[in-house]
Amino acid sequence: MDEGYGGMSNAELRRKVCHEPRRKHRERRATHHGPERSYQAFLSLPEGERARACEMDTVCGRPTDSQCLLTLMSRACRVQLPLLMPTKTKAATVARLDEVERAIGLDAFRRLSDPILTDNGCEFEDAGGIERSCTVPGERRCRVFCCDPMQSQQKGACERNHVEIRKMLPKGRGISFDDLDEVDAWFVGSNVNSEPRPSLMGLSPLAMLRAADPELADALARGLGICELPYDDLGLTLAAVNGERAGRGLAPLA
């Protein structure tokens, strides 16, 4: 019928003309990693290692923006770090993780981010660069594993937790991530990780982290500016971000 055979056209089919054309599924592109970094390899890790894994992803603003947020989320305590990146590229990802390692130290980086589970995005293609330490030559700072293609639910905790970031940097408001700076990222990270969660028995992710690993909590506060805020000072809104920017003499994001 689509080709016009039989002397009829789609216009003569009363119901078909009311339906939108079906979307074509994107073809799955080949993964950039071998079986040693596959999701099946991740599942073969001991249960304790999988439970404390770090899920890595990116949060983007407008399609035309260059900057984005690289997010690292600890499954164990739900702390999620939003790290500003100048571009969504594999080189920028490695460079940003290098900065984190230098800021908090190799041992703290390992406790926070080993192993890492991420997706098959182009920004995560340099698995070797992500894994190698930049402070101790020849050492490995983490192990990297990737979800199956188009199966982002395999790192669903990270995906769901992005909702908390979107409370402060919502979609559809004309926010350009190119206008963000490091202080904005720290402010968002401190607020999001200071919010009490029912799933953590009323504790915040940072409070849970401090109870489990106070040295790592101190390293994040000292090296990245991510620190727990008093409950009464929390502002999980875009207005709070704009208020903080106004205090620094900057224009609002939207």
What are these regions (language model features)?
Residues 1-178, 183-197, 207-254:
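Secondary-structure boundary/capping micro-motif
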